[in-house]
Amino acid sequence: MSFRSIVRDVRDGFGSLSRRSFEVTLASLYGLTGHHKGKTQSSLDELDDSPAIIPESRWASLPPELLREVIRRLEADESTWPSRRNVVCFAAVCRTWREMCKETVLSPEFCGKLTFPVSIKQPGPRDGMIQCYIKRNRSKSTYHLYLCLSNVVTAEGGKFVLAAKRHRKTTCTEYTISMVSGNISRSSRTNIGKLRSNFLGTKFIIYDTQPPYNGAVVPHVGRTSKRFNSTKVSPKVPSVTYNIAQVSYELNVLGTRGPRRMRCMMHSIPASSVEPGGIVPGQPEQIVPRALEDSFRSTTSFSQSFRSTTSFSKSIMDPSMDFSSARFSDISGSIMGGDDNGEIKERPLVLRNKPPRWHEQLQCWCLNFRGRVTIASVKNFQLVAAPSPPPAGAPTPSQPGPADPEKVILQFGKVARDMFTMDYRYPLSAFQAFAICLSSFDTKLACE
């Protein structure tokens, strides 16, 4: 029997589950979400006291040596989507098969592939880039991220990865990032993060539902302040968001003829990650999706992060998020933080846009996207690691810098009217790269 037929049999085996078992499972899901609907709920209530008996698959008792060989060959043969869904089906059979998959299927940092949902929160490959593209829907204000399945930059039909929806407000713009392609709302339980801008569209904060590693210099955590009569959020799953990055744009002296000047301060990624032997600590093992409809009403996250817009010459953020009118060199030199015990925490990674070069023949400013961008646009950019200055008061030994200071970590560019390529690599994740690229779509009133 071939390995594909084994996977096919396993996938078909899911259909043998009894309707009773399915309804019991569905009842537990309804109990978690708190959504109830008429007759369906009444029939489910009758099954609440019954134990969920789900028949074990006949493949669950296979010898570990055989399972390991099956997943090893499956991982090697089904390396691209859509056939890679067979690897996901393998992991969905039972706990034993899932644990076997964890041992064999590596994270994107080492295999360069997006397989399971948690892959979108894990760093990209160290060697090479993961190629994606973003489709913009102007009428619905939505943005969809797809994994490229072809080398043709304008080819569609890729594997869906993430989606975002823009919400314009009086003083800011918000982008809700979701794991589903349709029905994106702030109250959805499939949201994994958010992007918020200031009034001018020059400063952005990336929020994540995933907590960062302990050593990160992260500003205040935003906890929701729910209305007293709200019953949508379970007390077991609080709406908590973490400020993991800040994106800032500065006045572009080239106007619309050159790329925007931007910097990204990645609070959840240490600067040492791009040094030889560096790592990104605290990588998640599972996705933590949450509803975000009220996650920005906290006094610590909202009122301190984005103050009144009556005076733009002053800082619009609290001291830990100070972007005020300081220049980028001042910002990068003041991001060393510490905890209440005086312990110095690790400096976050800072990314800057790669400056363009003047092309004498074309008489324009150019960046080398290696064929991945075909249309000139002010939105196009390439990000590289900015040099990290030594901590204040510390001795100045020869500290290792980035292995390759000019290595492009993230590039984004236009290939059609509403289609843009997005290529990223270690230490950024797909979620972080997507959020940074979303900031490029927003109007920059003070930069152009």
UniProtKB/Swiss-Prot annotation:
Signal peptide: none annotated. CDD domains: F-box_AtTLP-like. SUPFAM superfamilies: F-box domain, Tubby C-terminal domain-like. Residues 387-406 are annotated as: Disordered. Pfam families: F-box, Tub. Expressed in roots, leaves, flowers and seeds. InterPro entries: F-box-like_dom_sf, F-box_dom, Tubby-like_C, Tubby_C, Tubby_C_CS. Residues 387-403 have a biased composition (Pro residues). Transmembrane segments: none annotated. Residues 56-102 form the F-box domain. PROSITE patterns: TUB_1 (PS01200), TUB_2 (PS01201). Belongs to the TUB family. This is Tubby-like F-box protein 3. The lineage of its organism: Eukaryota, Viridiplantae, Streptophyta, Embryophyta, Tracheophyta.
